[in-house]
Amino acid sequence: MTLDEYILQHIDAEGDYLHALWRDTQLRLSYGQMASGHLQGRLLKMLVQMIKPLKVLELGTFSGYATLSMAEGLPEGAEIHTFEVFDENEDFLREWFEGS
């Protein structure tokens, strides 16, 4: 059994919304391989759940996969702020953030 297989057997399943976002990222954005995926997303969610921050600052949103993964782990009333320098991703990000 590979390390990836072991990890995938012991972490939360990827939700339908995040899976759809990852797929849409691959289809619509240049450099889709830069997107965080299931393993990275679950790690970020777990870290946020352990630390329980009231505010998170993310620099580099890209497709928003990591952003939404961290948001899943935030406590009630917490905030996440994210910045992306590539303005061509803005419409894509708004679509997915507003739908979340």
Predicted regions and their residues:
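A short alpha-helical cap/connector motif
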Residues: 1-100
